[in-house]
Amino acid sequence: EIDFPKGKIMIAYGLLNGEIKEDMDVVKILQDCSLCKRCEEDCPSNIKIAEIINGTRYKLKNLLPEHKKIYENFHKYKNIFGEENFSYGNGKNAFFMGCLVKKEMKDVIISLLDKIGEDFKIISECCGYPLRKIGINFKKKNLDGYEKILFSCPNGMIEFMKHSPIHISQFFSKCDFKRDGKNYIYHDSEFLGRYLKIYEEPREIIKKIGNLIEFKENRKMARWCGGEIEYKLAFPEKAEELAKYIAKEAKEKNATIVTS
């Protein structure tokens, strides 16, 4: 039962009420959840399951070894992977690229923003939200002074909600794109979808480029893909199984490209 929401809620309740002592098994049980909120869509009692689990994590005194590593990397490098950050430009607007976008994408992103004709400063460091998901507090980066702030990663948008963040799909959805006629299957990420309610803009862009294919379970009912980095590092086998499930359906539907 500990693999299911009810079991994790019971563990959280017992820990918070002193009925259960914290040990590494308890830590592992409470961290073995991506906070994707998919279970909340099926919950008839409307229990805020992700909020309860995440809140309980802040009470934990111990970290999983994989989580300790990303915590150390963030505080040393401002990057959970321990990689070197970069910045580009000095515009009045900012594009918070974050740590999850591949560095090879930098030139593509710069080219797109240059074509729009607006000045952007590109920031590549981690927003830190993965640490909040595992129950760690830290001082938030100051992004005051920018007129607009774009994000490619929904984690960053959630971390900086007070700045009225704009997702790149929202920013580019009104632009024209060259069609390639390929079949694109779109996967709704849990944080862009269930947390931020951004569903249509990515689909609008895909329809301009090629053919949109939907997963059987989509939008607020979309399954999690196993890609949240803090979960994937700690539970790689489970994350891989989730990814295989998504990949299997994409293959069955003859998708050329899986995008999210």
Where are these regions (language model features)?
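Iron-sulfur-cluster electron-transfer modules
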Residues: D3, I9-S164
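Cofactor-cradling patches in redox/metallo enzymes
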Residues: N46, L100-I168, F191-S260
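Cysteine-cluster motifs in flexible loop/terminal segments that predominantly coordinate metals
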Residues: E1-D3, C36-C39, G226-E230, A234
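Alpha-helical transmembrane segments of multi-pass integral membrane proteins
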Residues: H187-S189
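Ser/Thr/Gly-rich flexible loops in soluble cytosolic domains mediating phosphotransfer, phosphorylation
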Residues: I166-K182
